[in-house]
Amino acid sequence: MKIKREHFNILRKIHKNANLSQRDLSSQLGYSLGKVNYCLESLKQKGLIKINNFRKNPNKSNYLYILTPRGISEKTKITLRFMQERIKEYDELKNELSTHKKKN
């Protein structure tokens, strides 16, 4: 499953803290409130999160965002893929610097 970077960032945030409101996510990630809402709905439709309504939540957030087992699995796969991409980029940059140093 291909997931957008924005969706991955939201998965990471709610995995750390399911009590974050949409406004909290918007503020912490630098996304518009509409974008956060759209991403959460998309993640819900893909079966990666569950959205529970808790009106008596002490921090007055009406919703609790919970990663499903599928969401946790997908987040893990994406994290691994992201790390592999970063390692590859690091190796490429390291080789470029090495080549540049040899030329000078």
Describe the role of every protein-language-model region:
Residues 1-6, 21, 52-76:
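Short, cationic-aromatic polyanion-contact patches
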Residues 23, 34:
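Key DNA-contact positions within bacterial/archaeal DNA-binding proteins
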Residues 27, 44:
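Alpha-helical residues within the helix-turn-helix
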